[in-house]
Amino acid sequence: MNRLTDPENLTNAFAQQKRNPFLSSGSLILAGGCIVLLLFLLLQGESGNSRHDQSAVSEQETQTSEKTKRKELIAYLQKYPDDEFAHFQLGELIQDRAPFQALENFSHVTERHPRYFEAVEAISEIALEQGLDGRAKSALLILVREYPEEGHYQKRLARLLFAEGKFNWALRYARRNIESGGRQAEDYLLVAEILRQAGRTIEMTGPLKQALYLEPDLYEAHLNLAYAALYSGDPETATREARWCLSENPESTTALRYLAIINRNQGDIDESISYLNQALSIDPQDLECLLLKADILVFQRKGEQAYELLKPLYATQQTDRRYVSALARAAGLTGRREEALELQQLNQRLIKEEDLRPSSLQSESVQKTQAGRK
């Protein structure tokens, strides 16, 4: 007898057929989405390549155009060498490629040109980049007169004058930079560093504290404050700042030397020598530390140790008056009278040579006189 098919089995069979992944609508949608995404990516790739190619072509066309324009301007200036408009255009085109030639072109631009001060600024930038400090200074002097409110010109000029040793003149422009709106820590630090070289140590504290207010962890400001406090009679501040510097840079021979000086001044010679030995283990050729240690040894009547410490440096330091004077004292203390006399004579010659050099005040006075004659 034939059995009828169970209705539940029929239902289950059809249910299994509907769940077939190859025939589900979700799978079809997913497959279609993948195809669309693939086509999109292919089109994007082609579009990106197209844009890249267009950009490369555009850049090449620009370079070709600039090259053609340079040739035209050069040919034109051979016929009309006094055309300052052409000189300005050529200077702009070649400033990055041929800075010295651009400097020459910009130098032909006079005050009659509507963009004269742009040419002067370009001269200052090129001259600074190429180490032509004299040209840069002349250009910056023009710019600070024309744009006294532009602090960055004042700062650049201050740095140049500082490097030349014209400290009082440099200080004037460094302060004008701050008055013009220069309120960054480095602006105050520059003022402090100029004051230091000018020998105006007590005045350093104000700008250094302002720098540290703006940047509490500025290492150079802490180190300069240690120096200012040391030579202004504030050993507590000097000690605190020197130790802070050592915590940031344990190999700072300068901070170690400051601590050595503080301990020497307080009569703790052993501690002072300990700091100096630590510094010299880091840098055996540190002249400042060597001179300080030799001075302490001479004070202790240990002339032979001081002489042995300094003598090996003679070949490289014989033009340094402080070194020659220290070696002369050590030689005299050890009974080397002839050598001590020769060193004293050398020291006198070095003093005369220094006296013949114009000081920063003298050089500023001369430059003012020359400027007044122009």
Q: For each of these PLM feature ranges, what is it?
A:
Residues 24-107, 111, 354-360:
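N-terminal leader/linker segments that initiate helical-solenoid repeat arrays
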Residues 1-15:
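N-terminal intrinsically disordered, acidic low-complexity segments at the extreme N-terminus
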Residues 84-85, 117-118, 151-152, 184-186, ...:
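Helix-start (N-cap) detector for alpha-helical repeat units in TPR-like alpha-solenoids
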Residues 315-355:
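TPR/TPR-like (Sel1-like) alpha-helical repeat modules
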Residues 62-72, 96-108, 129-142, 164-176, ...:
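Structural signature of tandem alpha-helical TPR/SEL1-like repeats
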